[in-house]
Regions:
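Amphipathic alpha-helical repeat scaffolds of TPR domains
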Residues: 1-8, 31-58, 84-102, 125-139, ...
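Solenoid-like repeat scaffolds
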Residues: 27-35, 79-85, 117-123, 151-157
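Amphipathic alpha-helical repeat scaffolds
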Residues: 7-14, 23, 27, 44, ...
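Helix-turn-helix repeat elements of alpha-solenoid scaffolds
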Residues: 11-25, 61-74, 105-109
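Short amphipathic alpha-helical segments that mediate assembly, nucleic-acid/protein binding
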Residues: 19-22, 147-150, 160-165
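A generic hydrophobic-segment detector
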Residues: 109-155
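Long amphipathic alpha-helical segments with strong coiled-coil/leucine-zipper propensity
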Residues: 48-77, 82-84
C-alpha cells in the first residue's frame, strides 16, 4: 500500500517536468474524490516540486514551480483541518514541514514536529511508527540512520513509481 496516489497522467506530467500541470491535475482529482491518498500526494508533490523541481528538471532559469509553495501550504492547512488524525497525512506533512517549513513561516516548521508526533499517536502500523520515530530521532541530523527492515518498510509505503516514492527510497535506503 503506497502512501501516495499515482497514475499514468501524473507519470506523464512528471516525465516532462510539468510541475504546475501535475499539481493542477492532483487538485482536480482531490476535488472529485476527497481521498486522503490524493491529499498526501498534494502535500508531498507540492513540497518536492518546490524544493527539488528546478534541480530535477534542470530548468533553473525557467522555473515552473512558482505556485507550488502556495499549494503546499494550502493542502497542509486543509489536511490539518480535515484529516488531523490520519497518520499518513501527519507523516508526510510533518516530514516536509520539519525540513522546509521555514519557507512558509517559522510556526510551520515547528508544526512539522507536532505532526510527526501525531503520526506516532494515531498509527497502529509498526512500520509507519518506525519511520516517524527515525525522523524525530534524527530531526536535526544531516541524514537519517538506516531503518531496520528498511527494504520491507519502503516497499510497503513507497513503491518507487513516482519521483516522490523514489525520493523516500533514497532517503531511507540510500539508493534510488
Amino acid at each position: 500500500m503506497s502512501i501516495f496516489y499515482y497514475d499514468a497522467t501524473l507519470s506523464a506530467y512528471e516525465s516532462h517536468f510539468l510541475w504546475e500541470q501535475a499539481l493542477g491535475y492532483l487538485e482536480k482529482r482531490y476535488a472529485e474524490r476527497k481521498e486522503n491518498k490524493i491529499l498526501n500526494t498534494l502535500v508531498g508533490f507540492s513540497w518536492l516540486y518546490f524544493i527539488e523541481g528546478p534541480i530535477i528538471s534542470k530548468k533553473f532559469e525557467n522555473d515552473q514551480n512558482g505556485s507550488t509553495l502556495n499549494t503546499w501550504r494550502k493542502y497542509i492547512d486543509l489536511g490539518a483541518a480535515e484529516s488531523p488524525e490520519d497518520p499518513f497525512f501527519c507523516f508526510i506533512a510533518g516530514y516536509t514541514l520539519s525540513l522546509h517549513g521555514f519557507h512558509i513561516s517559522e510556526s510551520y516548521e515547528k508544526k512539522g514536529h507536532s505532526l510527526m508526533e501525531a503520526c506516532l499517536r494515531f498509527t497502529n502500523d509498526p512500520w509507519l511508527q518506525q519511520l516517524a520515530e527515525n525522523i524525530l530521532l534524527n530531526e536535526h541530523a544531516k541524514q537519517y540512520h538506516p531503518l531496520q527492515n528498511g527494504q520491507q518498510i519502503c516497499g510497503q509505503f513507497f513503491d518507487g513509481r513516482s519521483l516522490l516514492d523514489r525520493y523516500f527510497n533514497e532517503v531511507f535506503l540510500g539508493s534510488s
